[in-house]
């Protein structure tokens, strides 16, 4: 029995949708009668195990770092120092996600390490799974849905674990763990419930209201042509007089003890920098962390964008704002990456033709960039990740997020090649065959799906996010579109990619052999956006995550607008629902129409139109179809989410302390990794 199948007996299940557990939570002390299948995958032809285990709705994967041995000792040392810097800030992400997270992590890890009793019981397995889910999400809220993870063991069993280990927990902490009404949701996106008041994210003190936060940000809005990203690196609190003020993330300020370590390792990295531009950007980042000055963050981003010559690159900072219901504050993340020269060369034609793509977009002329500058795109191999990028990671990134910097100085886009490969190697079989409409759809996917996915990611990051412009006088999107800004931007980039996936220009450029690659991507996108991604939701839940919402509203809008012409047909055969794209060219036309409207929404800051589009097509779920998807998926035993164990690095030094080389190995124990991180990189107090 696979671990996911076993979970159907012990848990509410993989992505949910299975029946409630047959084994009652009241038998936490009963010994499990069936051997536990951890869900590890079979070794590949070289003996490497890509998937190490599966629990709840998660599979744990390993990735390799191709080309590591080709790096010079200096480049290896640079990677090592940048990775140490990233890991040194990991506690920040935990505390940002929720103010109780570090206390709960310490408590759970203490039990896990100190308990000497019977570990063959249902209760212990439930506790272990809960801890792993918390580790995976960097806190007590699901990493994707943002809903609080509810333990499947009873409070009585937890009291037993506390007694057996000599540990204690306050009633406040127990309520946070067990009461569904306490800290229920990390990010609330329903404005009627109070975006700030109902969000458990730790970007706002508990007594700060949505109205107060918005008023404060409006009072400090930067209306210059080069605005800083206000609120990016701070928590909003009330001072003794009751006025709103910021607690900046900086050395000597909030999260200072962890940022001191980050700064130390960034300083170490400078001595191994590949070129002066890289060293300058690193020094800018250090100065920013020391002061919290957002003007220095701008300077860092400008110099980071200009640093395109090295083999090693990185992302480090308070970057993406998806976790802020108001879209201002960035989550801490770190990715250290090595350029894949061969794969990058194949995609250089996208960069070279960026202006052609911009000029050909079906958007209003006033929303097109007249001159596209500084787009850099590389396929990279990740060497290490931390914070918001780990264990669950993106597969593509486009930065910086500042609109004016992108227009004036350009942007960097990367596809995380070895992460995509690891997902593919660990991917379970059966979903395509179960949900594809017919044999031809399966054939297209098997023949072209891999390339289609990579091209979509490249177009999304390189052309999509870098495209378009705001109308004069329109504020940054987070201020105009507010809680809808993230999903609108992700959907806009998807629509750019989808529109061009069926363009003969890609065949002409040699990026794909035929338009069958585009057809495979259209099939996949509609299948996922309208059906398959629903396996990630618990029955009765709304769609919450920005990317899931955008896939839904893009797909559902096109389905509705093309329904009369039969562009996409929904059929039921033998009680199963299937989606069939009948007219790919017409669907491309619909993607183009929607792209024009979405670009207009962004360029003009049309909040009402954004709300109507997202709420109308991207939030609610057909319960009958949802249950069907859950039932069909459950039989396959494939976890809907994946995340990673990072490689471990050991540095060797000469007598002077200079790093002379770094060895890389690939651990296969997720729990071991997380405990090691807590031991070696716990640089914050548990309350901040």
Which residues make up each language-model segment?
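Post-HEXXH active-site segment of zinc metalloproteases
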Residues: 468-491
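Extended, compositionally biased alpha-helical segments that mediate assembly or anchoring
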Residues: 215, 583-688
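An active-site-proximal "capping" alpha-helix that borders the catalytic cofactor pocket
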Residues: 72, 275, 486-503
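Long, well-structured alpha-helical subdomains associated
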Residues: 93, 498-601
């Amino acid at each position: 029995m696979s671990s996911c199948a076993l979970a159907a007996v012990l848990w509410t299940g993989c992505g949910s949708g299975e029946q409630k557990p047959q084994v009652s939570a009241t038998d936490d002390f009963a010994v499990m009668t069936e051997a536990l299948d951890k869900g590890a995958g079979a070794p590949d032809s070289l003996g490497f195990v890509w998937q190490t285990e599966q629990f709840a709705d998660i599979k744990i994967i390993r990735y390799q770092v191709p080309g590591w041995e080709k790096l010079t000792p200096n480049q290896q040392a640079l990677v090592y120092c940048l990775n140490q810097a990233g890991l040194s800030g990991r506690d920040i992400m935990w505390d940002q996600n929720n103010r109780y997270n570090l206390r709960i992590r310490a408590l759970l890890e203490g039990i896990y390490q100190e308990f000497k009793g019977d570990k063959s019981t249902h209760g212990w397995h439930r506790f272990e799974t809960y801890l792993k889910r918390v580790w995976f999400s960097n806190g007590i809220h699901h990493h994707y849905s943002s809903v609080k993870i509810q333990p499947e063991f009873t409070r009585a069993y937890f009291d037993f674990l506390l007694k057996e280990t000599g540990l204690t927990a306050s009633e406040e902490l127990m309520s946070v763990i067990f009461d569904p009404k306490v800290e229920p949701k990390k990010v609330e996106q329903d404005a009627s419930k109070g975006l700030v008041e109902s969000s458990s994210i730790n970007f706002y003190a508990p007594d700060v209201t949505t109205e107060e936060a918005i008023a404060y940000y409006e009072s400090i809005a930067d209306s210059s042509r080069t605005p800083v990203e206000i609120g990016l690196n701070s928590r909003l609190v009330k001072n003794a007089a009751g006025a709103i003020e910021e607690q900046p993330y900086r050395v000597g300020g909030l999260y200072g003890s962890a940022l001191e370590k980050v700064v130390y390792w960034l300083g170490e990295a400078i001595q191994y920098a590949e070129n002066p531009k890289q060293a300058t950007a690193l020094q800018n980042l250090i100065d920013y962390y020391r002061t919290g000055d957002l003007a220095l963050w701008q300077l860092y981003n400008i110099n980071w964008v200009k640093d395109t010559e090295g083999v090693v690159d990185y992302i480090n900072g308070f970057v993406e704002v998806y976790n802020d219901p108001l879209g201002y504050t960035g989550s801490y993340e770190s990715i250290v990456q090595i350029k894949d020269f061969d794969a990058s060369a194949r995609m250089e034609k996208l960069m070279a033709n960026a202006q052609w793509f911009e000029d050909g977009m079906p958007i209003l002329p006033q929303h097109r960039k007249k001159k596209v500058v500084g787009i850099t795109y590389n396929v990279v191999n990740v060497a290490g990740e931390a914070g918001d990028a780990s264990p669950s990671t993106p597969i593509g990134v486009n930065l910086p997020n500042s609109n004016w910097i992108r227009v004036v100085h350009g942007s960097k886009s990367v596809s995380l090649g070895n992460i995509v490969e690891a997902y593919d190697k660990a991917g379970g079989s059966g979903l395509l065959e179960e949900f594809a409409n017919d044999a031809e759809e399966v054939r297209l996917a098997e023949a072209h799906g891999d390339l289609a996915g990579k091209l979509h990611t490249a177009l999304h990051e390189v052309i999509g996010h870098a495209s378009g412009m705001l109308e004069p006088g329109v504020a940054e999107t987070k201020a105009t579109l507010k809680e809808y800004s993230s999903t609108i931007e992700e959907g806009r980039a998807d629509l750019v990619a989808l529109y061009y996936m069926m363009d003969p220009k890609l065949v002409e450029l040699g990026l794909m052999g035929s338009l069958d690659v585009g057809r495979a991507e259209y099939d996949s996108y509609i299948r996922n956006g309208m059906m398959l991604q629903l396996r990630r939701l618990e029955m009765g839940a709304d769609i919450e995550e920005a990317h899931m919402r955008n896939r839904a509203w893009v797909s559902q809008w096109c389905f509705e607008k093309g329904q009369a012409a039969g562009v996409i047909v929904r059929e039921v055969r033998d009680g199963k629902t299937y989606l069939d794209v009948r007219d790919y060219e017409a669907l491309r036309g619909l993607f183009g129409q929607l792209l024009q409207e979405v670009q207009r929404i962004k360029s003009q800051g049309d909040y009402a139109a954004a709300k109507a589009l997202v709420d109308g097509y991207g939030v609610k779920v057909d319960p009958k179809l949802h249950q069907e998807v859950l039932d069909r998926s459950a039989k396959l035993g494939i976890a809907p989410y994946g995340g990673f164990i990072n490689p471990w690095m050991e540095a060797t030094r000469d007598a002077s302390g200079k790093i002379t080389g770094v060895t890389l190995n690939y651990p296969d124990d997720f729990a071991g990794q997380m405990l090691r991180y807590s031991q070696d990189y716990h640089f914050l107090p548990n309350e901040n």
